[in-house]
A protein has these predicted regions:
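Active-site helix/loop module of the DD-peptidase/beta-lactamase fold
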Residues: 102, 121-159, 186-188, 215-253
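Stable alpha-helical elements in mature extracytoplasmic
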Residues: 62, 66, 127-130, 144-148, ...
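N-terminal leader/targeting segments and the immediately adjacent pre-domain N-terminus
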Residues: 6-95, 121-124
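Active-site SXXK
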Residues: 84, 101-127, 151, 207-211, ...
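Catalytic-site signature segments of enzymes, centered on catalytic residues
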Residues: 98, 165-243
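Soluble non-cytosolic domains of exported or imported proteins
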Residues: 60, 75, 101, 105, ...
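Non-transmembrane alpha-helical segments in soluble domains
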Residues: 67-70, 116, 132, 149-152, ...
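Penicillin-binding protein/beta-lactamase superfamily catalytic region
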Residues: 185, 195-197, 216-218, 222, ...
Length: 306
C-alpha cells in the first residue's frame, strides 16, 4: 500500500515524462504561460545578407558544409548580426522568422539580468544577501549561509539531480511537474555553499522564487515586460511558461518562448554594456560583473552569473 501511495503521488510527473519523453521545442504548447506583449515601436535589425560564413568546417580530417553541420545538430535558427545588421539568417527543420523558439536554458541568463534589474531598483539590496531573507521556509533546511551570489554562480551545494534521461530526477520534476514553489522550498543541501561549482537548474528556480518574493505583488513576467521586453522594443509577442495556470510561478530555469530576432536583442543589450539606443536599461556595473571570468575556488570554466 505505501508503494502504491508513493507512485500515485509522483505519477503525474512521471507519466508526463513518459508521454512527452525528452524536452521538446513544442513543449510551450503543453505548459500554461504568461504573455509578453510586443512594443508599439519596434526595433528592427537592418538586413544585408552576405555569404561570409565558412563554407566548410573541418575537424579530424573530416569536413562538412557549414549549413549541414548546423542542421545536423538540430539547430532551428542561426543569425549573425554585426553593427545592427543581419549578415546571415537561416532557419532549419521547418522553422522561419515567425516561428516561436523556446529559450531552454537561455532563460537562466534572463533571470540573472532581472536579478540585476532588481538590485538597480533597490528591490534586492545585494547578491551577498542570504536567500532565507526572501525564502524563510528554507531556514529549517540549513540555507542560512546560501547567498544570492551562490545561486547565480551555481555553487549553492543544493541536492539536485540534473539528469535529462531519468523521470525521477529533480530536473524532470521541475520541468514537467507543478507547484514549483513547494518543490523549491523542499530542496536540501549536500555540502557547504561556495566550495564547488555544479550546474543544476534548481539554483535558477530558487533565484526565481527570490525574485518573486522581492517583487511582492508583481509577476516575474510583468517585471520582464517592464524592464526588458518593452524597452528593447521587441517585434513579437512572446510568453514565459509557468508551472500552473493559477497562482503559478515562471519556470525561470527555462521556457521563455519567443522569436530568434528578439532573443538577439538581449545580446545586443549586453554588447552595448546595458544601454539601448542611448538609454541605460541595466547598469553597466551589473553587465561587467555578471560576465567577467570567475576565478574563485568554486568556479568552473569561468562561469559567472548564469
Amino acid at each position: 500500500m505505501p508503494l502504491i501511495f508513493v507512485v500515485a503521488l509522483t505519477s503525474c510527473t512521471i507519466s508526463r515524462f513518459i508521454v512527452y519523453n525528452f524536452a521538446d521545442v513544442k513543449d510551450y504548447k503543453k505548459f500554461p504561460s504568461r504573455p509578453l506583449a510586443s512594443n508599439e515601436t519596434k526595433f528592427k535589425f537592418s538586413n544585408a545578407l552576405k555569404e561570409n560564413y565558412p563554407k566548410v568546417l573541418r575537424a579530424n580530417n573530416d569536413s562538412i558544409s557549414f549549413e549541414n553541420y548546423i542542421e545536423k545538430n538540430k539547430t532551428l535558427a542561426f543569425l549573425i548580426i554585426k553593427n545592427d545588421t543581419i549578415q546571415y539568417e537561416k532557419y532549419f527543420n521547418g522553422y522561419s522568422q515567425e516561428s516561436i523558439i523556446p529559450s531552454f536554458s537561455m532563460a537562466k541568463s534572463v533571470t540573472s539580468i532581472l536579478i540585476g534589474c532588481a538590485i538597480d531598483d533597490k528591490i534586492i539590496n545585494s547578491i551577498d544577501e542570504p536567500i532565507t531573507k526572501y525564502i524563510p521556509e528554507l531556514i529549517e533546511n540549513g540555507f542560512e549561509k546560501v547567498s544570492i551570489k551562490h545561486l547565480l554562480q551555481m555553487t549553492s551545494a543544493i541536492k539536485f539531480r540534473e539528469s535529462y534521461i531519468s523521470p525521477f530526477a529533480e530536473s524532470a520534476s521541475f520541468y514537467y511537474g507543478n507547484n514549483l514553489k513547494r518543490k523549491t522550498t523542499n530542496l536540501k543541501l549536500k555540502g557547504n555553499p561556495g566550495e564547488k561549482f555544479e550546474y543544476v537548474s534548481g539554483n535558477t528556480q530558487l533565484l526565481g522564487l527570490v525574485l518573486e518574493r522581492a517583487l511582492k505583488n508583481k509577476t516575474i513576467t510583468s517585471y520582464f515586460q517592464e524592464k526588458l521586453w518593452t524597452p528593447l522594443e521587441m517585434e513579437y509577442d512572446a510568453s514565459w511558461s509557468t508551472d500552473m495556470k493559477n497562482n503559478g510561478i515562471e519556470k525561470t530555469f527555462c521556457c521563455i518562448n519567443a522569436r530568434a530576432r528578439d532573443f538577439a536583442k538581449i545580446g545586443r543589450l549586453y554588447l552595448n554594456k546595458g544601454k539601448w539606443n542611448g538609454k541605460q536599461i541595466i547598469s553597466q556595473k551589473w553587465v561587467e560583473e555578471s560576465t567577467k571570468i570567475d576565478k574563485s575556488d568554486g568556479s568552473d570554466a569561468g562561469y559567472q552569473y548564469q
